[in-house]
């Protein structure tokens, strides 16, 4: 017998171009995991592809094949043990050779592989491990040619990508470069053991009154020789053991233990309670010797997607532990094109930003990867719900038998790997593949329920989403909701606003509607929508090397914006709404104002609709993050620098949020004639679970003078509906013949004497307003070793006061509207005494 030992093979690797045959062509690999672009950069063979036009200079890498090699010594293997070579991820077409003999051929980036090499390592001493990585870019083209009858309809990247189980964004997307990576992208190691815990998972039954729960822990054991193994299970909370049970392992290598938990501490998304994690451990024992020990954290909670007929159609919202959750959040793309460079610390910083921004759900998009364990660990610990796509995006995927088998293995592996995470509340079959079906006119008869028929149509991928994947989820994670696609709703058109989820791109893409009416364009769950904005100047400085290129329409800036037609779209929304500028810093700021306003109008209205029989169940903006320094829809850039939209969304998602808006007057289709009257509305949105009392004030303040133009409205002792919307004014009226000067509607709400939320509605568009000479004052009123408090006041209304984003500095709020008589405080952490104060900018400055 031997206790399981692991020997990471992270050092001592070298690599070379497959076409190079000389011994001096080998170059050292600093560390594995890595991909070839990282290793080429480390050897000064490649410039940073994220800077300038260097992506073009890296394109040669896309069409190359590579070999990685290392020499290792056979580990000591006691009698009765085996030696396994374990690969957690190979990218992608990999032929693995041990001492010249092929032991594995891989064609799926998303699949871990294990090879028993006990016999291959019988000889003592050194052994040579080589991995040939064939060019995925060229292999994909070959595979496409082999099936000319298949309709290769797709958006983004070369259509041949559909034939390869590799991160689809590597072929380029409308926010990312074409960087075809290859390499050992996740850990590789040797394992020596006589028996091991191959899998450990739990199934949880929570009583309806939440006073008790039943936790069943399951284990699968692999052993070299049969024998009387025993599994010692322990259940712990906060490091303290609650109970334990020892069970004999069956002949087929399984064991389970059931624990009754009284008064369990539940796992909640942040803002609703503690994200409590229990820990289940199993120790595999034989003859009193521990052979292997595995622990996993899990949560006790229920999670449902509620779909029921109502006056709006059919609902689509999430319920956790019996509580309806409005899921305000973001879509997530891979945080880097060079995936091994993302550390656990960087993942955690991203999720911490989500919490800081009051976002409760993150959608792992289907054109990237099944994320690293540390990503989901952070979501578990910080209470962020995960919408998890399977890795299919924007295409009509072929269904060759060998590809279907690979997809099944991939989905089984990843569902099993991730099923213990309480943060994952939904698995979704694909991203926008049903939209491709619609736009390409592919056959989709929802009433035909025979999967074999689907394979015979020109949309065979339906078989993956409506048979293969739901069967895997049902078998391996039966408590998790499965949804065939995003967007999708009961087989209806993907733009149907009455059912399922929808991607609303008629702001920016499509009909390019005014962002001021975004809330009228939504559906039951808005899982994509967005607006582009430039990142901050510090990020531009990173990838634009030449000062002469720092103007809004420079070639290098256009190169770093991969969205088709971005010039026209950005120009349209700027010219419609703002006084434009030609200097880069102001242009950056103006695009950020547009993005922040767009997100605010969408989120604010959709959250209000939550209170109307769950008309809108959630909103996930496109997108939270970037995979390289770029100009995109991200609200936080590659370097984790929030754009103003991040703060605008956070305010709308406040647990108690006040909202005010006047009806939209479309100036661009009325010859810019001003309206004679305007209706306005005032409401409160609350995610609190109990009714609370509050006081709401609405003031009407002149943009030009800062004075009140009419008597303020005050609602005292308002009963605020729990987890819903309280409408205070639905038929307010502004008579512009009486109140002709432009004015803002400034709303505030107090609860228990504390001012908890604000909202300011402005006359639209901003370009018609004179926003000069505001009388703004930003004053430091306290300072400690690493924290400052600023007091902000103004004589006239100020729009979108944005503070500089600086490395290591966190701001409590930004992108703020400031009005007279309502001083606001901002806390800055990480700014040391003596550091230069943060710069700031506001509209009209």
Swiss-Prot record:
Give the misc comment: In contrast to clade A beta-mannosidases, which are likely secreted, clade B proteins appear to be intracellular.
Keyword entries, A-Z = Carbohydrate metabolism, Glycoprotein, Glycosidase, Hydrolase, Polysaccharide degradation
Q: Under what name is this protein listed?
A: Beta-mannosidase B
Segments crossing the lipid bilayer: none
Stated EC number for the protein is 3.2.1.25
Hey, which pathway is this one from?
Answer: Glycan metabolism; N-glycan degradation
Q: Which InterPro entries does the annotation name?
A: Beta-gal/glucu_dom_sf, Beta-mannosidase-like_N2, Beta-mannosidase_GH2, Galactose-bd-like_sf, Glyco_hydro_2_Ig-like, Glycoside_hydrolase_SF, Ig-like_fold, Mannosidase_ig
The biological processes this protein is annotated with in GO are: glycoprotein catabolic process; polysaccharide catabolic process
Query: Catalytic residues?
Result: 432 (proton donor)
What would be an example GO MF term here? Answer: beta-mannosidase activity
Q: What does this protein do?
A: Exoglycosidase that cleaves the single beta-linked mannose residue from the non-reducing end of beta-mannosidic oligosaccharides of various complexity and length. Prefers mannobiose over mannotriose and has no activity against polymeric mannan. Is also severely restricted by galactosyl substitutions at the +1 subsite.
Gene this chain is encoded by: mndB
The record's comment on protein family reads: Belongs to the glycosyl hydrolase 2 family. Beta-mannosidase B subfamily.
The EC category is hydrolase
Enzymatic reactions? Hydrolysis of terminal, non-reducing beta-D-mannose residues in beta-D-mannosides
Give the glycosylated residues: 252, 717, 723
Organism whose genome encodes this protein: Aspergillus fumigatus (strain ATCC MYA-4609 / CBS 101355 / FGSC A1100 / Af293)
